[in-house]
Amino acid sequence: MEIAALGGQYQGATLLFYESPLDRGCDVAGPLRGPFYCPAAATVYLDRAYLQRLAGATTDSTRAALGYVVAHELAHHIQGLVGTTLLVDQARSRSTRALATRTLTTYELQADCYAGLWLRWAGQRGNLVAPPDPAGLLDAIAAISPRSDASRTVPGPWLDPLTHGTRAQRLKWLQVGLDSGDFNACDTFSAEAAGKL
């Protein structure tokens, strides 16, 4: 996995483990729960309780699901390094609410694809017990993230189809990353423009 393929140079993000709820993070008033990335601080916030619940889920996909959660948030860091975050923020500030939401969803699906790239890389190096199963990953996350949970995350709940895409879209883009091993295959923005998101 080489970020140079996207024209960027990798600079590490800070990983910050926190106890939920978080009163304030990334200039957003809390309470905040769950994993999220803060571009202003180049920091991935990881909720210990969330990760412990996920680790406690007894499925074959648990270890990969933990990696997927962290990889998805680090994918937002990569999006920032290569300029995608800035372009998305600019587009969202100049568009209608509906278009801004669609742009955010496209951005989140690209992060899922990048997470798929990482899962492929980790699997090839023997860092996963079993080959990643995208449906199993999302099932493990759904099992610990009830829809009724009113907790806030940035920019929205992990399972919210309005911010992160539908289950089918997430499965598709995770699989694209797993199958391709290529950052360029994760061009969700061109796919959205062609009506193929």
Regions inferred by a protein language model and the residue ranges of each:
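Solvent-exposed loop/turn segments at secondary-structure junctions
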Residues: P21-R24, Y50-L54, E73-H77, T84-V88, ...
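Active-site recognition of the HExxH zinc-binding catalytic motif
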Residues: L46, A64, Y68-L81, A111-D112, ...
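Short helix/loop segments within enzyme catalytic domains
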Residues: M1-G8, R102, T106-D149
